[in-house]
């Protein structure tokens, strides 16, 4: 009997590409709506999964949120469920006649677990089948052929680390979400989501907003002198106006050059993209979640390397010059800047890992072959890659120190002499400052002197970029999950905008948890669990042991909660999130309501005595902002749709304008 070879990939389009690379006689087979691929001459089958085809869940008898005790929920034995039955059926069918199974899922923790889940299905019908694993970082012919020429063993420790994360996140997420949702009265579609990583991340945003709200600006004073062609500044700033005025009065009509320096400064090139830096740069154009989805599509279609990586050093196995030469057909000017050098040496970051290289282009794409957003991400990856190989930028840097009656002034100037990598990486603006050539002893006339009163500014809100960086610093989540955490906070209406602003519900949830179960909101506990999962991957700890430790940790948190206070504070806080302002007719509270027909509107809390209402758009996610209308005691409203944010402004002003236009 001829035995078959079964190759398992993570997604269908990867299966299709790998099949076409390895075999010349590929036929597409179908079962229901699922396609898979067969090479008759090799009797090889390539089956693409849909990511996880098996999911973990709680037993059905624990589905009732209000009746199931939380301690029982967190101690429950989780059950596995096959969620893609057709794919499972195909795997079993082929596995029965297979003598070799190759796992070709993505090479990371999640990919290893996805492969192991499929293997368990295979081994349920063929327990003795030979199994191997191939690892690759790009879906290109060269990479795939190289990977299949040197298969390795499946890394069960790596898969178990992902399994531990899956179990812990499910246990913590379900338990805490039920805790908060039930005690706030927010269940059904409107439930309040809480999670192991999500909640400490949300606290960062809420705490920053509180810093901004509580910030008290302080006045300070700075002294400037204007000269022909430049402005100089006194190096010190003063909290006392009197002290500043005293010094200001000493300034004469001229200033003498005490020191003038001029030097050439080389500016280093950007380092190769790892996931964190890629998402931070991509967030200039779109949400990190969208950027990662597009990067994965480009990877599976052979245009860029694997986008989930910590590495910032190109391995010597990558033929950098070959890639640049190939890219010259689409980026000729940029490629020429790189190729015109006598020697090409790439920049290096601090982190070097052996699993995947930094993100780099693996195929040449033309603008017309990709969607607008796909091209934006592809171009970003290409330009970053070329910039890491380009010459350094060179600046002419100047500095002058001047003196006027004992009052010192300093000015700096810089001009870009050789653009180098800056001619390629167009996302980083070169800020130039004029400063003429001077020499020691020159006496310059002061055209104007200024004493400026300024105020200290509050810290800035977190942008997608700065939040990802802070999450990495605090070990919140992983390179593969941070963008998903941020997206979850947006979709659950905890945060909006970019930079991010928290909703009233976010304040309520975090403030209540800080008082009743602060551990949940701190990064320490989550970082500890991340370290434990690393130990599983290294084979130093067992998955059940880490999961049980996390259950015990959560149990202690639940037992320390004051449930009466939790319930009271949550219900009061959640109510605030629906309050839009004061009713102009009776002074009651205007709140967001829903009609029997399911339409949302703004109504008065004193209904039926007061029937004042305002219409609202029916599509998109509604956000009540902290900004209040200048004319009415009503907060402004924003709507988030697929196209972005729409600032509706004051709903009452909006309604009055509409009424005026349509009268």
UniProtKB/Swiss-Prot annotation:
Gene3D superfamilies: 3.40.50.140, Bacterial Topoisomerase I, domain 1, Topoisomerase I, domain 2, Topoisomerase I, domain 3, Topoisomerase I, domain 4. Residues 155-558 form the Topo IA-type catalytic domain. The record marks 52, 165, 169, 308, 492 as: Interaction with DNA. Keywords: DNA-binding, Isomerase, Magnesium, Metal-binding, Repeat, Topoisomerase, Zinc, Zinc-finger. InterPro entries: Topo_IA (IPR000380), Topo_IA_2 (IPR003601), Topo_IA_AS (IPR023406), Topo_IA_cen (IPR013497), Topo_IA_cen_sub1 (IPR013824), Topo_IA_cen_sub2 (IPR013825), Topo_IA_cen_sub3 (IPR013826), Topo_IA_core_domain (IPR023405). Mg(2+) binds at residues 10, 106. A zinc finger (C4-type) spans 583-610, 629-653. GO terms for biological process: DNA recombination; DNA repair; DNA topological change. One of its GO terms (cellular component) is chromosome. It comes from the Archaea. SMART domains: TOP1Ac (SM00437), TOP1Bc (SM00436), TOPRIM (SM00493). Its EC number is 5.6.2.1. Residues 193-198 are annotated as: Interaction with DNA. Signal peptide: none annotated. It is an enzyme of class 5 (isomerase). It catalyses: ATP-independent breakage of single-stranded DNA, followed by passage and rejoining. SUPFAM superfamilies: Prokaryotic type I DNA topoisomerase, Zinc beta-ribbon. Monomer. Releases the supercoiling and torsional tension of DNA, which is introduced during the DNA replication and transcription, by transiently cleaving and rejoining one strand of the DNA duplex. Introduces a single-strand break via transesterification at a target site in duplex DNA. The scissile phosphodiester is attacked by the catalytic tyrosine of the enzyme, resulting in the formation of a DNA-(5'-phosphotyrosyl)-enzyme intermediate and the expulsion of a 3'-OH DNA strand. The free DNA strand then undergoes passage around the unbroken strand, thus removing DNA supercoils. Belongs to the type IA topoisomerase family. This is DNA topoisomerase 1. It comes from Archaeoglobus fulgidus (strain ATCC 49558 / DSM 4304 / JCM 9628 / NBRC 100126 / VC-16).
């Amino acid at each position: 009997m001829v035995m078959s070879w079964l190759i398992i990939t993570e997604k269908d389009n990867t299966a299709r590409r790998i099949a076409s690379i390895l075999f010349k006689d590929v036929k597409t087979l179908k079962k229901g709506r699922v396609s898979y691929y067969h090479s008759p001459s090799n009797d090889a089958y390539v089956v693409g999964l849909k990511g996880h085809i098996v999911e973990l869940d709680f037993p059905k008898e624990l589905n009732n949120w209000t009746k199931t005790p939380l301690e029982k929920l967190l101690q429950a034995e989780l059950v596995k469920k096959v969620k893609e039955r057709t794919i499972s059926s195909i795997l079993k069918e082929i596995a029965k006649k297979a003598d070799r199974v190759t796992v070709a899922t993505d090479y990371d923790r999640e990919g290893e677990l996805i492969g192991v889940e499929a293997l368990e299905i295979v081994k349920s019908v063929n327990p003795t089948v030979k199994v191997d694993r191939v690892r690759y970082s790009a879906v290109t012919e060269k990479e795939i052929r190289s990977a299949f020429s040197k298969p390795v063993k499946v890394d069960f420790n790596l898969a178990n680390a992902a399994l531990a994360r899956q179990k812990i996140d499910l246990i913590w997420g379900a338990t805490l979400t039920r805790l908060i949702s039930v005690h706030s009265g927010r269940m059904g579609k409107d439930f309040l989501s809480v999670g192991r990583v999500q909640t400490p991340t949300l606290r960062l945003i809420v705490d920053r907003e509180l810093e901004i709200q509580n910030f008290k600006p302080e006045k300070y004073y700075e002294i400037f002198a204007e000269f022909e062609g430049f402005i100089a500044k006194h190096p010190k700033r003063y909290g006392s106006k009197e002290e500043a005025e005293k010094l200001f009065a000493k300034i004469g009509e001229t200033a003498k050059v005490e020191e003038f320096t001029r030097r050439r400064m080389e500016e280093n090139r950007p380092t190769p993209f790892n996931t964190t830096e890629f998402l931070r740069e991509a967030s200039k154009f779109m949400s990190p979640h969208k950027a990662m989805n597009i990067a994965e599509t480009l990877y599976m279609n052979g245009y860029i390397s694997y986008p989930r990586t910590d590495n910032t050093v190109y391995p010597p196995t990558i033929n950098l010059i070959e890639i640049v030469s190939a890219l010259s057909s689409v980026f000729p000017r940029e490629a020429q800047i790189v190729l015109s050098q006598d020697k090409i040496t790439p920049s290096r970051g601090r982190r070097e890992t052996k699993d995947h290289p930094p993100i780099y282009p693996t195929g040449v794409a033309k603008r017309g072959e990709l969607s607008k957003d796909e091209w934006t991400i592809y171009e970003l990856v290409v330009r970053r890659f070329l910039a890491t190989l380009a010459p350094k930028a060179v600046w002419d840097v100047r500095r002058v120190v001047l003196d006027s009656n004992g009052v010192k002034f300093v000015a700096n100037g810089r001009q870009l002499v050789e653009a180098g990598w800056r001619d390629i990486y167009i996302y980083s603006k070169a800020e130039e400052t004029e400063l003429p050539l001077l020499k020691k002893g020159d006496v310059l006339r002061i055209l104007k002197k200024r004493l400026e009163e300024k105020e200290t500014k509050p810290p800035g809100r977190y942008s997608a970029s700065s939040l990802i960086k802070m999450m990495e610093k605090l070990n919140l989540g992983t390179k593969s999950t941070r963008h998903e955490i941020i997206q979850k906070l947006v979709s659950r209406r905890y945060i909006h905008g970019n930079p991010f602003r928290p909703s009233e519900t976010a304040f309520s949830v975090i403030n209540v948890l800080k008082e009743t179960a602060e551990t949940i909101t701190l990064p320490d506990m989550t970082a500890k669990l991340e370290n434990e999962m690393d130990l599983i991957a290294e084979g130093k700890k067992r998955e059940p042991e880490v999961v049980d430790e996390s259950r015990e940790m959560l149990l202690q948190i639940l037992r320390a909660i004051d449930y009466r206070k939790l319930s009271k504070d949550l219900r009061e806080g959640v109510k605030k999130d629906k309050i839009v302002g004061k009713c102009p007719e009776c002074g009651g509270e205007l709140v967001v309501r829903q009609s029997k027909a399911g339409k949302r509107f703004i109504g008065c809390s004193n209904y039926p005595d007061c029937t004042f209402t305002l219409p609202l758009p029916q599509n998109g996610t509604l956000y009540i902002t902290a900004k209040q209308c200048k004319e009415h005691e009503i907060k402004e409203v924003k709507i988030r749709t697929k196209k972005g944010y729409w600032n509706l402004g004051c709903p009452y002003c909006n309604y009055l304008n509409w009424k005026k236009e349509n009268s």
